[in-house]
Amino acid sequence: MVSFGDPVPVLDSNVAYLSTLLSTNGNYYQPPVDPASLARLRHANAYHGMAMKFKVDQLCRFFTPSALLSRIDFEQAVWDYVVTGNCYFQKHYNRLGAVVRLSHLPAVYLRRAGIANVTDPLGVPDNFYVKVHPWGSFTQYAPDEVIHLHNYDLLQAIYGIPSYLCGVQDVLLSEEATLFRRKYFINGAHMGYILVTSDAGLTPEQADLIKRKVEESKGIGNGKSFYINIPRSGSTRDPVKIIPVGNIGTKDDFLDIKNETEQQIITAHGVPPILLGIIPENTGGLGNPVQALQIYHEIGSLPLRQVFLELNTVLGKAEVEFSEPDWKLLAA
């Protein structure tokens, strides 16, 4: 299973999909990308998080709830699909065996069942799932009890992957740039220094005191300071010297990094910038918001809507419905 950490090229990460094989206990298949990591990544960058919220809000805005599928269950499933590329529904039956309700199951914990759960010599059916609990146990669902909708991945057909996966490195880089800048200010607005004393006539006690003060002066993070005492160097120059480790003014490209990564993140999500509250940097602006919303509805919301309309095909009846926007009213 892949988590996020070291930057690696896309073409060198083929090992990622080896983890769609069975877990060590054989109870379920591991997803190619850790869904819990994807869920936490939602909070790493403002544009990344708000782009996903915008997608969810726009789809839920026109959803028509019913006795079969409530607005809450639908919204939670949409969040799962947008964030992880997977969503799951549990079927609830009446005494006659008809499906009367669908409830959301959390994608972070749902897994395709493995061989250890099946006695059928023909293997594991495609519609057999388990819910993995954080403490290690799991809940087993009956075959055909769970409906799984997923965003198709060309490298494996068991789990889906989110469409924004191509922008994950930009989300992480933007987060690292922000954290570095925060640590820089916590550190006292410097990147650290080397304090050197040579032939300064310091006693060992005085040298230890200076060392402790230097260690106590630095904050949490990147700016680390060092103290070097040379009791007898033979030099007659600069008995006390401060050597800067780095210059934040010339070495830091914070704004350039933030601007570039944010453009990449917005592109990965396919949401017009004006709909995310971005302030234009030029007099031309970012266009008409209503027109941008119409464009996103056609190229973003409608394709996502088709994913959930597939529930009607699975159930054999038209239970999932959406209303249409009134663009004239929005433009007024």
Each PLM stretch: what is its role?
Residues 1-115, 158, 248, 289, ...:
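Flexible, gly/proline-biased loop segments at the beginnings
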Residues 79-82, 118-124, 186-187, 219:
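Short, surface-exposed loop and linker segments with low hydrophobicity and enrichment for Pro/Ser/Thr
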Residues 16, 70, 75, 87, ...:
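Generic hydrophobic-segment detector
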